[in-house]
Structure formats: C-alpha cells, structure tokens
Regions:
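Long luminal/extracellular ectodomains of secretory-pathway precursor proteins
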Residues: 72-73, 88, 93-94
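C-terminal motif of bacterial Sec signal peptides marking the signal peptidase cleavage site
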Residues: 14-16
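Bacterial signal peptide processing site
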Residues: 18-20
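Extracellular/periplasmic metallocenter environments
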Residues: 30-31, 35, 40-44, 50-61, ...
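Contiguous segments within soluble domain cores/interaction surfaces
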Residues: 46, 53-83
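Proline/serine/threonine-rich low-complexity linkers at boundaries of modular beta-sandwich domains
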Residues: 22-28
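Bacterial N-terminal signal peptides that target proteins for export
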Residues: 1-6
C-alpha cells in the first residue's frame, strides 16, 4: 500500500511540475530620436516587450490602453490642450505599465498580459529644446 501512495504522490508531483501551455509573445522595440520602431500589430496575450534605446538621448516608454474607440489622434488632441498638464489622464486612457529612463544602448524588458484592444506607447521625456519627445513624434499606436 505504501508503494501505491508513493507512486501516486510522485505522479502528482510530476504533473504539478509540468510545463505551462500558455505562450508568451516576445516583441522587439527600439527607441530612437524620436520614434518607436516596432511591428504594426502585436498579438494579445502574455507579451514581453524588449526595449532597446538605440538613440543618443534618454528614452522611456509608458504603455497605455485606449478605451471607448479612441485612437492615437485622440491622445494628440488631449495632450495639445494646455489644461491636460494639470489633470490626471482621461478615463479612456489606462496606463498599464512602463519602463524607466534608459541611456543610449541600454535595454529593458516588460511582460504584460495584453487584452485585445488599442494601445499606445509614449515617451514623456523632454528633448534638449524643451519640447516633449511626444511632440517630436515619439508616440506610437
């Protein structure tokens, strides 16, 4: 009887150690002056965003999900309003995650479960001329 219990316990342990069937997408992103270089679309599900700053300036990114049928054009209109700087983001912008500021040549990765929908990447840092990287085009849907 004890051999049967030992065999059952071993089988249970092996089953618990089995591989995870969920797939994680790996997506390479590059940040340069002043653009994100990335695929046009990214599959939903668990995704690792592998970011490399290929530029000479500091770069970062914030990942936001857009709700209510909004697009990157709506984000531009919102950010163009001077009042937007003194308010929290609108309810249709859900900041999901981000990576910290990286110097040229540095890399960082971020893993998130991306639900189907529209997302935008933004770099909120300021350029040497005092305008934001977003104003220079570092925003991507």
């Amino acid at each position: 009887m004890s051999k049967l219990i030992l065999l059952a316990a071993t089988m249970l342990l092996l089953a618990a150690c089995g591989g995870n069937d969920s797939k994680t997408n790996a997506v390479e992103l590059r940040g340069d002056e002043y653009a994100f270089v990335m695929p046009e679309t990214i599959e939903s599900g668990w995704t690792t965003l592998e970011f490399t700053n290929t530029g000479g300036e500091l770069h970062e990114f914030a990942l936001a999900k857009l709700g209510g049928g909004r697009t990157v054009a709506d984000v531009h209109r919102y950010l163009a309003d001077p009042k937007s700087q003194q308010q929290p983001p609108p309810s249709w912008v859900q900041i999901r995650a981000g990576i910290p500021t990286l110097e040229g040549g540095e890399e960082a990765a971020l893993t998130q479960e991306l639900e189907p929908g529209r997302y935008v990447l933004l770099c909120f840092l300021d350029a040497p001329d005092g305008t934001s990287h977003i104003e220079h085009g570092m925003i991507r849907e």
